[in-house]
């Protein structure tokens, strides 16, 4: 383990459109097939909700080490549909629903 402070080791920022497949691969590693977000749904999330999709990029190798993503909504209860329908994101929504927290092992 490096003695570097976490902010020295990783860059934290919003995901870029061209990183959707890398995020989908991390999702595949972190979750069983029946729970992992598909490539299509991951691309939809990145395209429609990039403002709530944060990544950690390892500065030593330039690769994504993990990510956190969600969507905003006025709903107060997490719905299964949020995981498969990025169009349910309401940028003005008062609540943020966490859809995934993925970190490579």
List where the protein language model places each region:
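Short acidic N-proximal helix/loop "leader" segments that mark the beginning
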Residues: 1-5
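Short loop/turn microsegments at loop-to-beta-strand junctions
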Residues: 11, 51-52
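Helix-loop element at the rim of GNAT/NAT acetyltransferase active sites that forms part
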Residues: 14, 24-38
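Short loop/turn motifs at secondary-structure junctions and domain boundaries
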Residues: 44-49
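Conserved acyl-donor/pantetheine-binding loop and adjacent beta-alpha core of acyl/acetyltransferases
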Residues: 63, 67-101
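Active-site acidic-Proline motif in GNAT/NAT acetyltransferases
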Residues: 104-105
């Amino acid at each position: 383990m490096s003695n570097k402070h976490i902010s020295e080791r990783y860059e934290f920022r919003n995901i870029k459109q061209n990183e959707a497949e890398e995020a989908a691969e991390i999702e595949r590693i972190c979750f069983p097939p029946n729970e992992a977000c598909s490539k299509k749904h991951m691309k939809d999330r990145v395209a429609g909700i990039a403002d709530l999709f944060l990544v950690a990029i390892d500065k030593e190798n330039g690769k994504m080490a993990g990510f956190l993503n969600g969507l905003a909504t006025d709903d107060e209860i997490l719905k299964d549909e949020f995981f498969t329908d990025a169009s349910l994101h309401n940028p003005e929504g008062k609540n943020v629903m966490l859809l995934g927290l993925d970190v490579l092992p």
